[in-house]
């Protein structure tokens, strides 16, 4: 998703044709007047670049794929017209572009065309003919390179001469305009001569990973489909970007075809490693993106490809780590963050086959699934799942690390604590965010871990460095469902009365009990639920008060007395 200030012009496009195709001056002059050569309109500035410069209302960065997706939606909604006022100002982009909504749109199944640099015109010509057959007047597609997203808009305009065929290429790095070319029915076949050079100069191609034998994917979602399918296959299955695109898009059939058709044993070690690494020009692996996007079947097919490849074990393990951004993120952390439970299970099966061959500390780091922010502060993957309420993903993660246990007991405890850089535990965030189902799932894997009672109690307390405990936060917020869930996992933990009463003290900063804060906040339903937990555990208020200092213990007992009366 590079954001770059590259200044293309019609002159550069012409120069490409002169240098690469030896086109005559007369032909160039003819093209200039015919509008067959893609150009920017004088009505809008092509210098404006707001890609990766604006966040949406949730604070998430708006990048090229979100801008391209929004452009496609506007093009389709308005039969080929786009209001560039929505793209021309940061505040307008913030108001109109939602990262979560665009991510949903991007992940909808689609018709896929693999397109080499020299074949852009062939595919555009094919789609125009398909539009004619179906009496369509406009259609928009996503164009995806290995590290950038653009949009393609096609229109058929009625004219007295039988119709004009308009091509629009939207590049988010020229945020408030598009390239345009126009043909008519008499010269429609000339579209087939268009290549990537007619739309992007060399600097753009290099930045977008399209230099030399570049490959793009044209993604057509205009007709709903239950699963993605490939209309145009890549000419070369050994192209280093083929498996990357297949993993990213969930194109299982393509991975299976490579496994079935390509004689992997005939490849050199270097070619085989490059093919299976499936990385884009920024070093981002296709396996990471498959985990991020939840493509379980594709990951399974990739595992079978690895099995048949004969790749040495060390290299195979290296690929399965699925790291990106210089080790800042891993595929497992992305799967946990997005709640892809089945994907985690599939990945877990691949990992467990080779776990015995992975050096222990590397395996531990891999399973912790750290995400490192911009200043290299670490956040464990399980924390994301707890914070976001992904209950099934939490259970899948528990199955991965516990069935059978892949680490020693101490490291399992650290994984389950899921403490981020500031020592805040994941369960605390789940309790704070009201993620009742996630809390219940956490209780399930806690029991599965078969830890000693002291460690289990420590994890259930979920206390940060400031003395803030999980139950304190739930009582403070007054979330009844969360407190009920906590009561259930406390009950199934089978702690001693002393341990259970300590947790029910629900201490916060300065030793204040959560009950006191709940009473002050008039969270009476939460208090009623809390008292039900105390009764269910056969714990007396006096046993709980013993864990508080004299003043807070006295206040606690006074409130309990007043409520009962």
Swiss-Prot record:
InterPro entries: Ankyrin_rpt-contain_sf, Toxin_15_N. It comes from the Bacteria. One of its GO terms (biological process) is proteolysis. This is Effector protease OspD3. Effector protease that disrupts necroptosis in host cells by mediating proteolytic cleavage of host RIPK1 and RIPK3. Pfam families: Toxin_15. GO terms for molecular function: peptidase activity; toxin activity. The lineage of its organism: Bacteria, Pseudomonadati, Pseudomonadota, Gammaproteobacteria, Enterobacterales. Belongs to the Toxin_15 family. It is an enzyme of class 3 (hydrolase). Its EC number is 3.4.-.-. Disruption phenotype: Host cells display necroptosis. One of its GO terms (cellular component) is extracellular region. It is found in: Secreted. The keyword Protein biosynthesis does not apply. The keyword Heme does not apply.
